[in-house]
Amino acid sequence: MSNLCRNIKVFFKVFLYRFKQNKLNQAAGYLTYSTTLALVPLIMVFFSVFAAFPVFNEITGELKQFIFTNFAPSTGDAVGEYIDQFVNNSKQMSAVGIISLIVVALMLIHSIDRTLNSIWLDTSVRPAIFSFAIYWLILTLGPIVIATSIGISTYVTKFATYTFEQDLGLSVGIKLLSLMPFFLTWFIFTVLYMVVPNKKVSIIHSAAGALIAAVFFTLGKQAFTWYITTFPSYQLIYGAMATLPIMLLWIQLSWTAVLLGAQLSAVLADMRSLDDSNIQIEKMKEEK
């Protein structure tokens, strides 16, 4: 019991120290700025990839709804109009304009890569060609993976909901299905924490950090939506420009949740290293 309390105390000390060391608030602000610049290019690339695969035409609506509810709570209608405008405008762009947008999107991925690796205290640098290949795969395959996951979850939800409706005694199952977006978010964060760092990250540590990030992300989304709908004074202040500060604030909160989860995963790895070191020390003492 004493060892457990000691480990918990050490964990929180290490977590707070690393939080200050990595300046997560500043890092979240930096990623918010990068995301704002790359938002339009990312949307353009995502939906351009979907357009290249007719199989995803049926879930485009579900994908937009996923973006609205998770990344733009309470401003879904306005963001939906912007997305349609972005996609339509991208069809009229020149090759130079498209390349420029792709470069901006790749720069965001690079920013995420560098920020997460700094949390794991990894200062190694990949070869430029290797990094470009990884970023390009993320930019092109990422939308396909996300669309496939959303499509599967949507299909399972609809099928299971229909099945449960045939049996009133299984109403609990319908409530469990409402957690599908949460599990999808948890899965995406887990993959993010495993794939992006240059160091090998345990799936247990990644899943633990991703779980906390998904919880904060989901609770933050609900609290943010409640505040926006309950205290709409921001509309009186900003008027037609209200969507912009709302988006910026939500992006900031989202990145804070993501970085906190990453920090938790990294600290768990640090704690494991400390435990291994203590075991080695004890063995050396016993041998003496």
From Swiss-Prot:
Membrane topology: Multi-pass membrane protein
Keywords: Cell inner membrane, Cell membrane, Membrane, Transmembrane, Transmembrane helix
GO cellular component terms listed in the entry, alphabetical order: plasma membrane
InterPro entries per the UniProt record, alphabetical: UPF0761_bac, Virul_fac_BrkB
Parts of the chain that traverse the membrane: 36-56, 92-112, 127-147, 176-196, 200-220, 240-260
Pfam families reported for this sequence: Virul_fac_BrkB
Compartment list: Cell inner membrane
Family the UniProt entry places it in: Belongs to the UPF0761 family.
Protein's recorded name: UPF0761 membrane protein HSM_1104
Organism: Histophilus somni (strain 2336) (Haemophilus somnus)
